[in-house]
Amino acid sequence: MSKIPSVNIKALLDAGVHFGHKTSRWNPKMASYIYGERDDVHIIDLRQSVALMSVALNAIYETVKKDGKILFVSTKIQASDIIAEYAEKCGQYYVNHRWLGGMLTNWKTIAGSIEKLNKLDKTLENEEALMGYTKKEILNMSRKKDKLLLSLAGIRNLNSKPDLLVVIDTNKEHIAINEAVKLNVPIVAVVDTNSNPDNVDYPIPGNDDSIRAIRLYCSLFADAALQGLEESMKASGVDMGAMQEHTDKGLTSKNVSKLKQTKKFSKTKNIDEETNTEFEQALNDADENKNSDNA
């Protein structure tokens, strides 16, 4: 039986997930996810991060298990390569450079751009066809192809709307989120202390700037998707040895209903005692280490 990945307080602390933004930059809607503040920086309540990450990973797992498609989105510099790496690892789709307005809500136009990209690819790979073009024309075609690839490389095999959107940095990717909301596509997102969690179905309180944190999130997301894929293949009677080949081709579309979940775990009774104790101890240890360094 497949096991959905899990994460603990220590792993989140080591990745710097608990560091929010300066208190002056916070979004009051994130109040219930904030533990406190240290040196004018908000500290995220990692007890809730652990609990809500589990809910989000289950959503990813269930989506892929039911042959759904996931679109990973983050166009910020520090996340761009990581998003592409892990989306490809689990055979899903991604946008990691620029979100083109209408990528979800005006799919017909985007599909037309993908068709142009595929035609350019076909032409540039055909040596015989290239003999009919000048060097300048070939150079222009190559430039057009490279420009299209920046925005479309991760979705060129996506033939319909995704079943789940996974976002890092909701402020930067607000257009993608708005389009997903219009189409009733569920959203998993890392929400930092300056974020608005309102339209996020599966919020994960955490730092959305640290490269270590982003890599940790994406690794967990990809592992959950791969576990879902494994279950999907077993149910279909597919040879597990062929799983990687299947992944490379992408998944077929199927509507996946939103999972019931609780967004906020502000009451300690919703957090197991072991996680609560671990978080409190970790913060105390951090304070003691800081005090000893300053002594």
Swiss-Prot record:
Keywords: Ribonucleoprotein, Ribosomal protein
Span list, region Disordered: 247-295
GO cellular component, one term: cytosolic small ribosomal subunit
GO biological process, one term: translation
CDD domains assigned: RPS2 (cd01425)
Transmembrane portions of the chain: none
UniProt keyword Translocase, yes or no: no
Pfam family, one: Ribosomal_S2
Molecular function GO labels: structural constituent of ribosome
Matches recorded under InterPro entries: Ribosomal_uS2, Ribosomal_uS2_bac/mit/plastid, Ribosomal_uS2_CS, Ribosomal_uS2_flav_dom_sf
HAMAP family in the record: Ribosomal_uS2_B
Family: Belongs to the universal ribosomal protein uS2 family.
PANTHER family xref list: 30S RIBOSOMAL PROTEIN S2 PROKARYOTIC AND ORGANELLAR (PTHR12534), SMALL RIBOSOMAL SUBUNIT PROTEIN US2M (PTHR12534:SF0)
Protein name: Small ribosomal subunit protein uS2
Native source species: Rickettsia conorii (strain ATCC VR-613 / Malish 7)
Organism ancestry: Bacteria, Pseudomonadati, Pseudomonadota, Alphaproteobacteria, Rickettsiales
